[in-house]
């Protein structure tokens, strides 16, 4: 028959395949690995074809099997094939599950491919593309791993079918010719299985090659440090694979614990029944005597009608009652190990059967008394045997209970170890997830900052287009001087503004003031808020603003009334830390979201300059002279 098919070491993290031994070991591919559980068996010891002596191609010549031989072989083959069938069913169930995982892996791989195409088409960051490329490599390896697993299951199926045919050929009910036909079918199936072995071995070798590429790629990423998320993704995927394996193992361990617990309960019930049976045997009258003859003597008695006919003098019928009593341990032990005759002679010291002239009658009476002791002896022997058998059953049940208790302990320990491993994996995953979240936050921050800087740059270009190159230069200088500074206090700002008030007022009439105020009142706060966040990030301000609408309202009032103090006071209250950069971001946001003309632009820059640096007010004042 064929060599045994076996798949070993299902929890290993390395891959191995021996086409001669048909060994497949599970693989860690940073994801859910191919998993093939132990499947093994050896051809039965009775398997051979030497029991068929061929003559004429299809007849028995000698050593023909007996009916007993045939029935015995039938039972052996049936038991063997039942085992193979159970293994085959389990194998098919696992192949079905692997097929489902393969379908999911294919869908995931296709999704990753589409995501990568989208990133490339959208000119995404190199780090995002690198990360997605690595994800795709993982998805491709996962898919190939499940295809490899299925190939292993297919090889196992063919090997099992071959062995079933070989087993059928071993039947003693079929002719050598029929056996030969089955053997030919089995050998063909075995050849198919060997080809499947070769295919699985080649796939596993290719799997290792691809895994090596993935490992190399990961090492490069770790060494270069340029794709932290890709590395973290790989670590996360590895842990998720371990988590999936652990979850399966926990499920199996729980099933095992449930099974052994059921066996333990069965063992307890069996022990209870055995103990009840023992108690029942000990509580029978003869059982009580076996346990305590002093307390419960064993008794037997029989009425006899003995016919005497040999000697005319004593001819007739003798009516007697024979009795036997055991009331101590020594006598009980002797009777159980000797005959009734021995007991009568040696314990009762009654060796002479003839005590009167009626020889025939005396002998018959003596024999009846011996028979009474034999009768009691047999009853007590039966009782002792039943008690011994019951005690043996109790001991066996206790041993079985002890074994099942140990088995439950081991199953429980195994489950607890897996649960501990689950918690460890969960903690590691939590740490990795936090790192991924932090890395994503950093990348999002970096991306948002880049976008904000670009947004600020585009704004300055728009200032040039709308108000002229000198207006852009003024805005750039204001942004530059504001960095690292705090806004000036109210009195300083008012003093500076008063210095240039007359010049400023020469440039602005009442109509201009009304137009500027109207432009400010028409701005959309939602647009201002959105732009403010981007300008703040672009200019390096990380604080928050409060009462934005109030500030714009105060500015409009100040434009109309020429009373700037309330505005300067409000500015101190809405800007956290009094950062000058924040004020610049606010002003830029208003310029972006309003319809201010060049006069309004100059006034806004002059007022802002008074809160930052006097030189900016001077430059704003000169700006009007353009």
Swiss-Prot record:
Residues 276-286 have a biased composition (Polar residues). Residues 282-385 are annotated as: Receptor-binding (R). Residues 276-308 are annotated as: Disordered. GO terms for molecular function: pore-forming activity. The keyword Transmembrane helix applies. Residues 450-626 are annotated as: Channel (C). It comes from the Bacteria. Residues 23-225 are annotated as: Translocation (T). GO terms for biological process: defense response to Gram-negative bacterium; killing of cells of another organism. It is a multi-pass membrane protein. It is found in: Cell membrane. This is Colicin-Ia. GO terms for cellular component: plasma membrane. Belongs to the channel forming colicin family. This colicin is a channel-forming colicin. This class of transmembrane toxins depolarize the cytoplasmic membrane, leading to dissipation of cellular energy. Colicins are polypeptide toxins produced by and active against E.coli and closely related bacteria. Keywords: Antibiotic, Antimicrobial, Bacteriocin, Cell membrane, Membrane, Plasmid, Transmembrane, Transmembrane helix. The chain crosses the membrane at residues 580-594, 597-612.
């Amino acid at each position: 028959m064929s060599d045994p098919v076996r798949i070993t070491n299902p929890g290993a993290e390395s891959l191995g395949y021996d086409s001669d031994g048909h060994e497949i070991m599970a693989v860690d591919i940073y994801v859910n690995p191919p998993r093939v559980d132990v499947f093994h068996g050896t051809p039965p010891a009775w398997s051979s074809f030497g029991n068929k002596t061929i003559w004429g191609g299809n007849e028995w010549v000698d050593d023909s099997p007996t009916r007993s031989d045939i029935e015995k072989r039938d039972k052996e083959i049936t038991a063997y094939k039942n085992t193979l069938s159970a293994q085959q069913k389990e194998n098919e169930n696992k192949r079905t599950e692997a097929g489902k995982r393969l379908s999911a892996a294919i869908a995931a791989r296709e999704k990753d491919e589409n995501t990568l195409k989208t990133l490339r088409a959208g000119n995404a960051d190199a780090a995002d593309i690198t990360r997605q490329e690595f994800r795709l490599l993982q998805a491709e390896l996962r898919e190939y791993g499940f295809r490899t697993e299925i190939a292993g299951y297919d090889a196992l199926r063919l090997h099992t079918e071959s062995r079933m045919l070989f087993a059928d050929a071993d039947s003693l009910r079929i002719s050598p010719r029929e056996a030969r036909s089955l053997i030919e079918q089995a050998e063909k199936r075995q050849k198919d299985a060997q080809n499947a072995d070769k295919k699985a071995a080649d796939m596993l070798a290719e799997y290792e090659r691809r895994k090596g590429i993935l490992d190399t790629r990961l090492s490069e990423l770790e060494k270069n440090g340029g794709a932290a998320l890709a590395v973290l993704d790989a670590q996360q995927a590895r842990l998720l694979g371990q988590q999936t394996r652990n979850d399966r193992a926990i499920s199996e361990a729980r099933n095992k614990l449930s099974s052994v617990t059921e066996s333990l309960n069965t063992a307890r019930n069996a022990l209870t029944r055995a103990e009840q049976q023992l108690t029942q045997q000990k509580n029978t009258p003869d059982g009580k005597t076996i346990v305590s003859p002093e307390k419960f003597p064993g008794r037997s008695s029989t009425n006899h009608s003995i016919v005497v006919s040999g000697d005319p003098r004593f001819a007739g019928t003798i009516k007697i009652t024979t009795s036997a009593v055991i009331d101590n341990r020594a006598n009980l032990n002797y009777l159980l190990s000797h005959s009734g005759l021995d007991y009568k002679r040696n314990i009762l010291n009654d060796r002479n059967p003839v005590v009167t002239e009626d020889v025939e009658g005396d002998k018959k009476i003596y024999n009846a008394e011996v028979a009474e002791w034999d009768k009691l002896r047999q009853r007590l022997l039966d009782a002792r045997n039943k008690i011994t058998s019951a005690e043996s059953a109790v001991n066996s049940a206790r041993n079985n209970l002890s074994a099942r208790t140990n088995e439950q302990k081991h199953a429980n320990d195994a489950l607890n170890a897996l649960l501990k491993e689950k918690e460890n994996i969960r903690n590691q995953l939590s740490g990795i997830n936090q790192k991924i979240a932090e890395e994503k936050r950093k990348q999002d921050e970096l991306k948002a900052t880049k976008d904000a800087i670009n947004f600020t740059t585009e704004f300055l270009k728009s200032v040039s287009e709308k108000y002229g190159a000198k207006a852009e230069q003024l805005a750039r200088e204001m942004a530059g001087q504001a960095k690292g500074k705090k806004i000036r206090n109210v009195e300083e700002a008012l003093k500076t503004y008063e210095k240039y008030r007359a010049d400023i007022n020469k440039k602005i009439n009442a109509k201009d003031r009304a137009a500027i105020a109207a432009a400010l009142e028409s701005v959309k706060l939602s647009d201002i808020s959105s732009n403010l966040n981007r300008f703040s990030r672009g200019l390096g301000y990380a604080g928050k603003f409060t009462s934005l609408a109030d500030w714009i309202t105060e500015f409009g009032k100040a434009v109309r009334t020429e009373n700037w103090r309330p505005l300067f006071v409000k500015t101190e209250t809405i800007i956290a830390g009094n950062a000058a950069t924040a004020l610049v971001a606010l002003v830029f946001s208003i310029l972006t979201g309003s319809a201010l003309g060049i006069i309004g632009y100059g006034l806004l820059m002059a007022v802002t300059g008074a809160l930052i640096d006097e030189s900016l007010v001077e430059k704003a004042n000169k700006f009007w002279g353009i």
